[in-house]
């Protein structure tokens, strides 16, 4: 996971102090890219422990098209609690946009189903894109999408994914984002009879919150360990059939967790 540590190091050295929506303040850069070869292991940060259960359940929650945190709470996941209303609703966030982007009236588009069909039928297409940035729905969302658009690319029997993330909390959020979209790439590749290729992570505003700087410096003192392997149940060929029990992470031996406050 050297690319992730290099990003953190770059922001600590070259980041600009900026104010932000939360009032916390950040060190920020604009424009950066990381690449991960998914054939070399599953890109899960090893210089601190990541909560893999949260990553898997959140992704399954997105893929369900769900926007209520009830499913997450039932599975012991609290990462969206701060933004939900009293009934657990978040508005038309990621799951809604991925699975039922509203066109007009009762019509909607299932972008996940559409892109999988494109990968299978027209793998050389340059239109294999999913967007969560629905301008007409932004004011209804509890939190505007941070990871806004991703595109797939097929070559030599391998599926790659590139994510554009407009806003990135490097210390807390980015390890989740890397793992989540890498896992989604593995899942879709399996459903399309392809091998995983690369995950490419492109950023707009990538930042370290000012109350995360000490934690970031601590993390940079730790030596990365070998990447784990994520095994998927090979019998699953439909993206909506995956369940938590269909994922097994092998050889994950991270350094201890590092706690940091969430900026809301």
From Swiss-Prot:
GO aspect biological process, one term: methylation
Reaction catalysed by this enzyme: dUMP + (6R)-5,10-methylene-5,6,7,8-tetrahydrofolate = 7,8-dihydrofolate + dTMP
Predominant place of localization: cytoplasm
Binding site for (6R)-5,10-methylene-5,6,7,8-tetrahydrofolate: 51, 169, 263
Coiled-coil ranges from the UniProt annotation: none
Signal peptide annotation: none
UniProt xrefs under Pfam families: Thymidylat_synt (PF00303)
Pathway listed: Pyrimidine metabolism; dTTP biosynthesis
Keyword Methyltransferase: yes
Active site, UniProt feature: 146 (nucleophile)
GO molecular function, one term: thymidylate synthase activity
GO cellular component: cytosol
Database matches in CDD domains: TS_Pyrimidine_HMase (cd00351)
Task performed by this protein: Catalyzes the reductive methylation of 2'-deoxyuridine-5'-monophosphate (dUMP) to 2'-deoxythymidine-5'-monophosphate (dTMP) while utilizing 5,10-methylenetetrahydrofolate (mTHF) as the methyl donor and reductant in the reaction, yielding dihydrofolate (DHF) as a by-product. This enzymatic reaction provides an intracellular de novo source of dTMP, an essential precursor for DNA biosynthesis.
Protein name, per record: Thymidylate synthase
């Amino acid at each position: 996971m050297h690319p992730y540590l290099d990003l953190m190091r770059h922001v600590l050295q070259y980041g600009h102090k900026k104010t932000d929506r939360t009032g916390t303040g950040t060190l920020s850069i604009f424009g950066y890219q990381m690449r991960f070869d998914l054939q070399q292991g599953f890109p899960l940060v090893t210089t601190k422990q990541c909560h893999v259960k949260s990553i898997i359940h959140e992704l399954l929650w997105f893929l369900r098209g769900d926007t209520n945190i009830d499913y997450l709470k039932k599975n012991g996941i609290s990462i969206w609690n701060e933004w939900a209303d009293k009934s657990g609703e978040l508005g038309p966030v990621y799951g809604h946009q991925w699975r039922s982007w509203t066109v007009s009236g009762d019509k909607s588009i299932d972008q996940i189903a559409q892109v999988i069909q494109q990968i299978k039928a027209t793998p050389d297409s340059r239109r294999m894109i999913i967007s969560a940035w629905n301008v007409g729905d932004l004011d209804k969302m509890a939190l505007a999408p941070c990871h806004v658009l991703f595109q797939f690319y097929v070559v030599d029997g391998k599926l790659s994914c590139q994510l554009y993330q407009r806003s990135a909390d490097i210390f807390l959020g980015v390890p989740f984002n890397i793992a989540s979209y890498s896992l989604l790439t593995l899942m879709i590749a399996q459903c399309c009879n392809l091998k995983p290729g690369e995950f490419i992570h492109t950023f707009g505003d990538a930042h370290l919150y000012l109350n995360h700087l000490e934690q970031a410096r601590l993390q940079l003192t730790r030596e990365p360990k070998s990447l784990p392997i994520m095994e998927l149940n090979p019998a699953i060929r439909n993206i909506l059939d995956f369940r938590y029990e269909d994922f097994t992470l092998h050889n994950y031996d991270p350094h201890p967790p590092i706690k940091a406050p969430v900026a809301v």
